[in-house]
From Swiss-Prot:
Transferase among keywords: yes
Membrane topology reported for the UniProt record: Multi-pass membrane protein
Alphabetical keyword list: Heme biosynthesis, Membrane, Mitochondrion, Mitochondrion inner membrane, Transferase, Transit peptide, Transmembrane, Transmembrane helix
Top-level taxonomic group: Eukaryota
EC number(s) recorded for this UniProt protein: 2.5.1.141
Record keyword Transmembrane present: yes
Similarity comment: Belongs to the ubiA prenyltransferase (TC 3.D.4.8) family.
Lineage start: Eukaryota, Viridiplantae, Streptophyta, Embryophyta, Tracheophyta
InterPro entries (alphabetical): Protohaem_IX_farnesylTrfase, Protohaem_IX_farnesylTrfase_mt, UbiA_prenyltransferase, UbiA_sf
Function in brief: Converts protoheme IX and farnesyl diphosphate to heme O.
Catalyzed reactions: heme b + (2E,6E)-farnesyl diphosphate + H2O = Fe(II)-heme o + diphosphate
CDD domains: PT_UbiA_Cox10
Protein name: Protoheme IX farnesyltransferase, mitochondrial
Length: 431
């Protein structure tokens, strides 16, 4: 009896302790006990005594399995997030390389000139915004391809210049085949977009400009200073491209903005060549500033081309492209940049060259804004032409009547018209 009572007391203690695991040893015991209390029916005291230790082991195994699964899920999530972060970093790296290969800021300026040409070429107050977007997108792709090819051909030169040695190709951030593939895809996509959404004339001008820039201007930079004038032709084509995309043809009015761009680029690049002459010499480029140590020749060239831009405002008004206000604005703007060029001509220092360079940066957006602000639509042009024709016809009729009147009058001797006392002047004579 004594043994049975001792065994019974010991088993009851085991059952109580096994049914309520110690939370200090197993932190999840309370939750597990709560789950077991709702999910399992009550059992007898003897069965609990026999299975107490087994229940604790099964609960511990269940907790361990749950913790292992949670750790595995956490590790999988961390691995996925690390892979996503690596892919995002890789995408950011190549996106930056494409941005620098395309010379995005310069390409945006090209797109701005092309878009201005498109708006001027519409000739009407209503502008086709889808056509404008297609033109700008195609121009951007062509410019990105041309600039990328330019950097591919000039890897060795760029590696010797301070301002270009950190570009993607000289620094090794992207391979040459990768850059070639990018330039090819961008150029082909831009030409196809212009051909399908605008017209073949615009696509042809864009493709020709790409070839002229990448395969003529780029190698010519290392051969002869005339490369600056060839590059000016390249810069003058985008507004012509935009005009052709809008109207499908090239007219006299379409040449005003390209002419302004051509003459504007000369003082702009002369100032840049003077400021970066040491870098150009290190890179092996044949710029005019390297053959003009005093800077007098490049200053004279810059000043002369500034004067060439003065008549453009009058021509734009005379040809019916803009209103008369543009004459005044264009003249004042051109005289302002000519003043900086004259200042550089008198005192050929880096400070004066930098002032002329900054003035050239300001000139182009203001000039294009004036063209857009004062442009005259086709209807207004026709009205002006009709008014001018009516004025000319009225003045012509007056001249004809006066001529007929003079012919109808008989010839009068000079003596009869003289103030003679006894010979009065003829009645039809009007002094």
């Amino acid at each position: 009896m004594w043994r049975r009572s001792v065994v019974y007391r010991f088993s009851s203690r085991i059952s109580v302790s096994s049914s309520l695991p110690n939370p200090r040893l197993i932190p999840w015991s309370r939750e597990l006990c709560a789950v077991n209390s709702f999910s399992q029916p009550p059992v007898s005291t003897e069965s609990t005594a026999k299975l107490g230790i087994t229940g604790v082991r099964s609960d511990a195994n269940r907790v361990f399995a749950t913790a292992t699964a949670a750790a595995t899920a956490t590790a999988t999530t961390g691995e996925i997030s690390s892979r996503v972060a690596a892919l995002a970093g890789l995408g950011h790296h190549y996106a930056r390389c494409y941005w620098e290969l395309s010379k995005a800021k310069l390409s945006m300026l090209v797109v701005a000139t092309s878009g201005t040409g498109y708006i001027l070429g519409t000739g009407n107050a209503a502008i086709s915004f889808p056509g404008l977007c297609y033109t700008c997108a195609g121009t951007m792709m062509i410019a990105a391809s041309a600039n990328s090819l330019n950097q591919i051909f000039e890897i060795s030169n760029d590696s010797k210049m301070k301002r270009t040695m950190l570009r993607p190709l000289p620094s090794g951030r992207i391979s040459v085949p990768h850059a070639v593939a990018w330039a090819t895809i961008a150029g082909a996509s831009g030409a196809c977009l212009l051909a399908s959404k605008t017209n073949m004339l615009a696509a042809g001008l864009a493709s020709a400009n790409l070839v002229l820039y990448a395969f003529v201007y780029t190698p010519l930079k290392q051969l002869h200073p005339i490369n600056t004038w060839v590059g000016a032709v390249v810069g003058a084509i985008p507004p012509l491209l935009g005009w052709a995309a809008a109207s499908g043809q090239i007219s006299y009015n379409s040449m005003i903005l390209p002419a302004a761009l051509y003459f504007w680029q000369i003082p702009h690049f002369m100032a840049l060549a003077h400021l970066c002459r040491n870098d150009y010499a290190a890179g092996g480029y044949k710029m005019l500033s390297l053959f003009d140590p005093s800077g007098k020749r490049i200053a004279a060239v810059a000043l002369r081309n500034c004067f060439y831009m003065i008549p453009l405002g009058f021509i734009a008004y005379d040809w019916g492209l803009t209103s008369s206000w543009f004459c005044l604005e264009s003249t004042l703007l051109t005289l302002a940049i000519a003043a900086t060029a004259f200042s550089f001509y008198r005192d050929r220092t880096m400070h004066k060259a930098r002032k002329m360079f900054h003035a050239s940066l300001l000139f182009l957006p203001v000039f294009m804004s004036g063209l857009l602000l004062h442009r005259v639509s086709n209807d207004n042009q026709q009205q002006l032409v009709e008014e001018a024709g009516l004025t000319n016809s009225v003045s012509g009729e007056v001249k004809t009547q006066r001529r007929k009147k003079r012919v109808a009058q008989p010839p009068v001797a000079y003596a009869s018209a003289a103030p003679f006392p006894f010979l009065p002047a003829p009645s039809f004579y009007s002094p």
